[in-house]
């Protein structure tokens, strides 16, 4: 007890001291001002450009294709020099990529797990050269070193956001999947002991599949994947085990139809959540990019207006005087082209008021026209009476 209470504070204190020291070191490094900011910004722009990503994806894909061709001995023997030159080229490209990224962000580079993966791949690339240099071309581990060169295709992960999303989804399912696999292991343990006791007897049992605990586990794994379970059941039927069919059906129902489907369901749920989150992030990034473009355009327009207002025209006339003079020369019949003027709130307000006034004027004109028509009709009715009276007077 005393050791327990005296050990933990020391470890916590040492951990806090390490964290404090790392934070202090990081703060001190962040205060260092670089004198090559323009060059750093240029390389950052190059690394984040679409062209650079396409070049790296093409390089990794071509390298993987040549690795596949290298598995054919005849092709490798015929184009030996081509493979050697291409290998040097690919390694040079990977090293240049590493140096550029470290140059741009020498501190934050090591905080990204995918960058650490790239560094590990670079180390793996150097293993065959070191073995040939130290042990010669007949080293026992040289074939293994050549085989793990296929891991360089994992560099595509850092350039594919979709693959990174799937990896995040798999990482989020670790605890749930571990729980499901633990339950499956417990189920297999129970059925392995039961199968060993029922079908692993020495006189007439199936010793090849149920003779010991290891073979029983392997047999249950075949039953869980429903791979060759009919052959296993035929072996038990030949030995006339009456409960073998019930045992097999029960284990397949529990392991294959429940636990494995539960495992697949958990993976699908987390993958869907990650894909929805990925789509939301893409939408948010698009909206942010549009907002940034709008801000840049507005800032540029404001700078242009300020520049025009600050510049003086010949004859001591500034921008405001120019606008006032331009207003005096305008007529209501002059055509004008206004960009985005109709989207302003002031224009919409004036336009709505104008429409209301126009409606009022139209209604008044309609009333006036009705009155005019009424007066004209009355005048037409009175005209025959006046003509008849004039004719009677003449007679």
From Swiss-Prot:
Q: In which tissues is it expressed?
A: Testis-specific.
Question: What keywords appear on the UniProt entry?
Answer: Calcium, Calcium channel, Calcium transport, Cell membrane, Cell projection, Cilium, Developmental protein, Differentiation, Flagellum, Ion channel, Ion transport, Membrane, Spermatogenesis, Transmembrane, Transmembrane helix, Transport, Voltage-gated channel
Q: How does it sit in the membrane?
A: Multi-pass membrane protein
Q: List residues traversing the bilayer.
A: 49-71, 81-107, 109-131, 144-160, 169-195, 243-268
Which segments sit in the membrane without spanning it?
217-236
- Ranges per topology, Extracellular: 72-80, 132-143, 196-216, 237-242
What regulates this protein's activity?
A: In contrast to the human ortholog, not activated by progesterone. Activated by intracellular alkalinization.
Keyword Ion transport attached: yes
List GO terms (cellular component aspect).
acrosomal vesicle; CatSper complex; endoplasmic reticulum; motile cilium
Annotated localization? Cell projection, Cilium, Flagellum membrane
Q: What is its main location?
A: membrane
Q: Which InterPro entries has this protein been placed in?
A: Ion_trans_dom (IPR005821), Volt_channel_dom_sf (IPR027359)
Q: Which domain of life is it from?
A: Eukaryota
Q: Show the Pfam families listed in the entry.
A: Ion_trans
User: Which GO biological process annotations does it have?
Assistant: establishment of localization in cell; flagellated sperm motility; sodium ion transport; sperm capacitation
Phenotypic consequence of gene deletion:
Mice are normal but males are sterile. Male sterility is due to defects in sperm motility unability to fertilize intact eggs.
Give the molecular function GO annotations.
Answer: voltage-gated calcium channel activity
Catalytically driven reaction(s) = Ca(2+)(in) = Ca(2+)(out)
Q: Which residues lie on this side of the membrane: Cytoplasmic?
A: 1-48, 108, 161-168, 269-395
Instruction: Quote the subunit structure annotation.
Output: Component of the CatSper complex or CatSpermasome composed of the core pore-forming members CATSPER1, CATSPER2, CATSPER3 and CATSPER4 as well as auxiliary members CATSPERB, CATSPERG2, CATSPERD, CATSPERE, CATSPERZ, C2CD6/CATSPERT, SLCO6C1, TMEM249, TMEM262 and EFCAB9. HSPA1 may be an additional auxiliary complex member. The core complex members CATSPER1, CATSPER2, CATSPER3 and CATSPER4 form a heterotetrameric channel.
- What is the protein's known function? Pore-forming subunit of the CatSper complex, a sperm-specific voltage-gated calcium channel that plays a central role in sperm cell hyperactivation. Controls calcium entry to mediate the hyperactivated motility, a step needed for sperm motility which is essential late in the preparation of sperm for fertilization.
In the record, the note on similarity to other proteins reads: Belongs to the cation channel sperm-associated (TC 1.A.1.19) family.
This protein is called what? Cation channel sperm-associated protein 3
This protein's species is Mus musculus (Mouse)
Q: Which gene does this sequence derive from? A: Catsper3
């Amino acid at each position: 007890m005393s050791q327990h209470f005296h050990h933990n504070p020391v470890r916590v204190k040492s951990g806090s001291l390490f964290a404090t020291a790392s934070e202090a070191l990081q703060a001190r490094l962040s205060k260092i001002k670089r004198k090559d900011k323009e060059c750093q910004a240029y390389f950052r722009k190059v690394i984040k450009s679409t062209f650079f990503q396409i070049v790296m994806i093409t390089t990794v894909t071509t390298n993987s294709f040549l690795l596949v061709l290298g598995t054919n001995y005849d092709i490798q023997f015929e184009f030996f020099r081509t493979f050697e030159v291409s290998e040097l080229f690919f390694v040079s490209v990977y090293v240049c990529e590493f140096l550029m990224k470290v140059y741009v962000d020498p501190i934050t580079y090591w905080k990204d797990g995918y960058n650490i993966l790239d560094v590990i791949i670079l180390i793996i690339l150097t293993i065959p050269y070191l073995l040939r240099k130290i042990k010669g071309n007949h080293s026992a581990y040289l074939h293994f070193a050549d085989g793990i060169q296929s891991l360089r295709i994992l560099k595509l992960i850092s350039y594919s956001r979709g693959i990174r999303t799937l990896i995040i989804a798999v990482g989020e399912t670790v605890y749930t999947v571990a729980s499901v696999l633990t339950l499956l292991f417990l189920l297999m343990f129970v059925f392995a002991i039961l199968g060993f006791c029922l079908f692993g007897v020495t006189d007439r049992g199936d010793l090849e599949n149920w003779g010991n605990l290891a073979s029983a586990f392997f047999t249950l794994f075949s039953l869980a994947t429903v791979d060759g379970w009919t052959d296993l059941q035929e072996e038990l039927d030949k030995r006339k085990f009456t409960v073998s069919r019930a045992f097999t059906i029960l284990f397949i129902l529990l392991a294959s139809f429940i636990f494995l489907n539960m495992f697949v369901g958990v993976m699908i749920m987390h993958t869907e959540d990650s894909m929805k989150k990925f789509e939301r992030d893409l939408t948010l990034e698009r909206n942010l990019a549009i907002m940034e473009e709008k801000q840049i355009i507005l800032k540029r327009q404001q700078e242009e207006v300020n520049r025009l207002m600050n510049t003086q025209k010949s004859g001591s006339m500034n921008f405001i005087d120019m606008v006032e003079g331009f207003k005096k020369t305008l007529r209501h019949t002059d055509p004008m082209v206004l960009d985005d003027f109709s989207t302003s709130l002031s224009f919409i307000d004036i336009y709505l008021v104008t429409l209301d006034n126009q409606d009022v004027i139209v209604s008044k004109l309609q009333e006036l026209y009705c009155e005019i028509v009424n007066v004209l009709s009355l005048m037409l009715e009175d005209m025959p009476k006046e003509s008849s009276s004039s004719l009677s007077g003449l007679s």
